[in-house]
């Protein structure tokens, strides 16, 4: 499926597979080990003999700066021992070198073709809730992101509306929800990409469709009917429903 990857400066499209880390090859084994350790993987894909020294150095510096929260993995795309991973991530059709930032849950949080900077990789390390949102989208599902301060007056009503939306036969099995506390420091970078004010006293719910299009934005109260209306509008081609926008720093809303 086509997924929109969040980068520090732009949106990069890459073909990714939700089960890529389950492929039986040596890179998949490394990804599994790193993910189970709760770390990010910075994966450098390249062709043997290509000049990748500067990219390799950037990845090395990013790993050092992550202070135990990330590991580097290097993959020669011609290596048959990593063939499944290369195929599943669509790297055989991508410009090389390519660096992917992969969260512990397997979500690709950013992709950098050609070159990357250590800070860009650091920015790609979104928190667990942000990674969960991205994984849901990369699995081809709709995600409802509920940004709720502790003690939000609308939390109960919002939870009921979202539960009804997810249970509706029109979308059952194809929607997930993630609740994010705006005070959670680990999620500040992701909230910034969503353009949600973490200091707001009110709750904000975002309806996001693959690859990362925000098709509905709801402040405090939200209804199942409103969400389905915005979803239908986006499927009909009017992606400006509910405010439009995207879940990346370069998205400027409806274009």
Residue map of PLM features:
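Bacterial N-terminal signal peptides
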Residues: 2-10
